[in-house]
Swiss-Prot record:
Origin species: Caulobacter vibrioides (strain ATCC 19089 / CIP 103742 / CB 15)
Pathway where this protein functions: Bacterial outer membrane biogenesis; LPS O-antigen biosynthesis
Job description of the protein: Catalyzes the synthesis of GDP-perosamine from GDP-4-keto-6-deoxy-D-mannose and L-glutamate. Can use only L-glutamate as amino donor. In vitro, can also use GDP-4-keto-3,6-dideoxymannose to produce GDP-3-deoxyperosamine. Involved in the formation of S-LPS, which is required for attachment of the protein S-layer to the outer membrane surface.
Disrupted gene: phenotype observed: Mutant produces altered S-LPS.
UniProt similarity note: Belongs to the DegT/DnrJ/EryC1 family.
Full protein name: GDP-perosamine synthase
């Protein structure tokens, strides 16, 4: 084990107004799901994404579920989802009684392969869920074109992509709606929390109604529909607003970290493949994701263990949905790239608090364990 301080794979940066805003919630006793910070956070986030509406939720998974329900996704429907994603993307579809249909990914960006969408569409297909994996927006033009041609809804899973851009537009502004996560390891955090963005007035109103148990906003304790308790607390929103105030600083700090990786990984030669950045926009690098080169005697999982012994935390790329028990029945022969990325993909420490010396340690450790 290393005697040096441990380098975490992710860490929140809480050096703005977070403490002052949380104390205001406590001093005013507005600690639950009503308060000024919820209103201000929603408005500020909508403005940041360039959309009309932002609906705060208690986490990113409930944001996905709420959006799908509001869009009318239900039993018998199909939603196309990448196999290589965090399981919440597929689970949210399953919660609705609908069926996730899995699409393979691009080997360079890790995002879904838009060229493979058309073959998966059936009369039951109702929506496409492009997941902006690890901070880079999917190639949205062909996805939106397929959706228009087949009259399908598009919900962006932008959990990992706050601040990312595609052809001059921010994540959250490209589909019919989009969802975000503010878990503690995300680009901005509320501890736990989520957000939905949309330009659709009716959809926003329905999501707000469903979020608060379905209570009529003009008639207290009258419930015209069955809803959910997916509300964010004022304390969560207070942290989120403080985080959003400094998001540009957070992203700039991440870009410095990425620059160090890009420069220093040359030392490792073909033992790793660096992430591909598309020319269509800004990659915000929620995670700096590499693939291990061919011909190594070690494995990705062994590399993670060896790095851990040297005081450096890393993470595997997400396991594809179709190799895990809940979704193994959805496996097809056309998900091979997702499988390969799931075997050799590795997420290195990526957060705004890292120093150049930290990255030097990571590179030196990789040089030692990649054999």
């Amino acid at each position: 084990m290393s005697d040096l301080p441990r380098i975490s794979v992710a860490a929140p940066r809480l050096d703005g107004n977070e403490r002052d805003y949380v104390l205001e919630c406590m001093d005013t006793t507005w600690i639950s799901s009503v308060g000024r910070f919820i209103v201000e956070f929603e408005k500020a986030f909508a403005d940041y994404c360039g959309v009309k509406h932002a609906i705060a939720c208690n986490n990113g998974t409930t944001a996905l579920h709420l959006a799908l329900v509001a869009m009318g996704i239900g039993p018998g429907d199909e939603v196309i989802v990448p196999s290589l994603t965090y399981i919440a993307s597929a689970n949210s579809v399953t919660y609705c009684g609908a069926t996730p249909v899995l699409v393979d990914n691009d080997p360079r960006t890790f995002n879904l392969d838009a060229a493979k969408l058309e073959a998966l569409i059936t009369p039951r297909t109702k929506a496409i869920m492009p997941v902006h994996l690890y901070g880079q927006i999917c190639d949205m033009d062909p996805i939106l074109e397929v959706a228009r041609r087949h009259n399908l809804l598009v919900i962006e899973d932008a959990a990992e992509a706050v601040g990312a851009t595609y052809r001059g537009k921010k994540s959250g502004s490209l589909g019919d709606c989009a969802t975000f996560s503010f878990f503690g390891n995300k680009i901005i955090t509320t501890g736990e929390g989520g957000m939905i963005t949309t330009n659709d007035d009716d959809l926003a109103a329905k999501m707000r109604l469903l979020r608060g148990q379905g209570m009529d906003p003009n008639r207290r304790y009258w419930f015209p529909i069955v809803g959910f308790n997916y509300r964010m607390t004022n304390i969560q929103a207070a942290i989120g607003l403080a985080q959003l105030e400094r998001v540009d600083e957070h992203l700039a700090a991440r870009e410095r970290v990425v620059g160090w990786y890009e420069q220093k990984l040359a030392r490792l030669g073909n033992r790793v493949t660096k992430p591909h950045v598309a020319l269509t926009g800004r990659h915000v690098f929620w995670m700096y994701t590499v693939r291990l080169g061919e011909g190594l005697s070690t494995t990705r999982d062994q590399v993670i263990k060896d790095l851990d012994a040297l005081g450096i935390e890393s993470r595997p790329v997400f396991h594809p949905m179709h190799i895990m028990p809940p979704y193994a029945h959805l496996a097809t022969d056309d998900l091979k790239i997702a499988e390969a990325c799931g075997v050799d993909g590795l997420n290195l420490p990526t957060h705004a608090g890292l120093t150049e010396a930290d990255i030097d340690r990571v590179i030196a450790a990789l040089d030692q364990v990649l054999v």
